[in-house]
Amino acid sequence: NEFYRPGQRLKVFVLKVEDTPKGPAVFLSRAYPKLISKLFELEVPEVSSGAVVIKSVAREAGSRSKIAVASTVDGVDPIGSMVGQRGTRVTAVINELGGEKIDIIEWAEDPEKYLANSLSPAKVVEVRIQPRNKALVVVPEDQLSLAIGKNGQNVRLAAKLTGWKIDVRSPENVDEKGIGKSEKEEGGEVEKKEAKKPAQGGSAS
């Protein structure tokens, strides 16, 4: 929810232009995820040149976003390029978006590494890939609330970013088979149960 002043200059994403009887109608958005990609293109020469590629964006506009980036050139640090010296580049984008928090993580072809990175700033102990595009992510007990995030935001954005259904657990809540203790197996498939105590774990898809 933003408030605009007359004469205020804003960067927006053009969704589409339609011809109407009264003339062209331009549909604009400040919440569209691709707006962040375009803002970084303006701020980061490595992005505009293609040396750094934005692989995925997950956004809850006005609150927080996660961006996965990768380098196409040896020796180019994708995260460092996005952040800029003393954080100048990412700060410029944050200011344009009214203070929206932005997490920049490194994309990885290996799903286990990518999933671990996506839950930053939490530290991940282990990622266990499960059937049907699900992943069980194990984090230390003291990192559990950080991995899940306030109202589940961190794990929710990580799921959107990666396209995986993520179940976050502490080591104490994972059995030797790598299954969350709030789950059960029926007919060879894992059926999730809603955890009664959010502090024990959290999932998002």
Region spans (language model):
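RNA-contacting regions in translation and RNA-metabolism proteins
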Residues: 1-205
